[in-house]
Amino acid sequence: MASTYAVLSEGLEKRFGDVHALRSLDLAVPRGTVCGVLGPNGAGKTTAVRILTTLTAPDGGSAQVAGHDVRREPAAVRRGIGVVGQYASVDGDLTGAENLRLFARLLRAPRSRAAELLERFELTEAGDRPARTYSGGMRRRLDLAAGLITRPDVLFLDEPTTGLDPHSRNGIWDAVRELTGEGTTVLLTTQYLEEADQLADDIVLIDGGRATHSGTPAELKALVGSYAEVVVLDAAALPAAAAVLDQLTGSEPVLDAEKRTAGAVTTDPTVTLPLLVRELDAAGVGVVDAGLRPPTLDEVFLRLTHRKRAGHPVPDRPSAGHPVADGPPTDHSRKEPAA
């Protein structure tokens, strides 16, 4: 089983004093895939990553990364992983080439690896310039290159595109896709849910120290259902439109006065567009546009974490039938705990 998964944990537990940060975390990440780990602040993501990268010891359970046990073989785990944090790890006073050669020397990698990575990330021409003169996108590419010096089996990637413009963000996304195409496994933590939607083969949602849901992006969206949205003729009609949406969907509507929109998620298959239009008309709401569409991952995240906190039941399984709560790991990231 260990040969199938690049990251495999069972029953991970971690306490910090009275705080139970991780509660029986099970995770199974197949080799050569991207697993997106999402959750509110304080949910357990950071603690989980610190354990998997051998920076923190678990209080219970077990974990293997790149085929090695994090407790018994921490040095072997570190040789098999790369870690790219949210903040730049490179020295701004050194050139790009000097930074990578320094990493190569520290990690006992060939000196030629630095030149190879500069070329791969289109930094060769800037290689003789101090890193502090690089743009945000260039520095993130240099960070990513530094994390790949040892050709890791598993790359831990934290907030890889924070603060980047769309063009630079797309460049990082393309680089991550190339890595998985070559067989590297990526564990991605990000607050940009569009990023997880674009990159992740599977997503684990952690809340309150547990993995509450997991599956592909499409499966998690299917849990939530559809998103009903209307554009009203007059912003003054938004409260009335919200009342209609609340009655039909049972969800708290989201209002945008500037765009004159009201929207809410619904899992009720009887909520159709004709029904929505009729109810709005009966309420005297003038409508410019109305529609039902699949939810975004942001809407899924807000819906599932809000329902959990509000005490409402959330389905245990995505529509495709993959377990999302308790049970043994499958080919999808399984339940996990908090940070």
Feature map (PLM): residue ranges:
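Solvent-exposed beta-strand sheet faces enriched in polar/charged residues
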Residues: E10, V231, D256, G291-R293
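A generic structural signal for secondary-structure junctions
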Residues: G82, R108, D143, I149, ...
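ABC transporter nucleotide-binding domain
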Residues: W173-T267
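ABC transporter nucleotide-binding domains
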Residues: T4-S9, K14-G208, H213
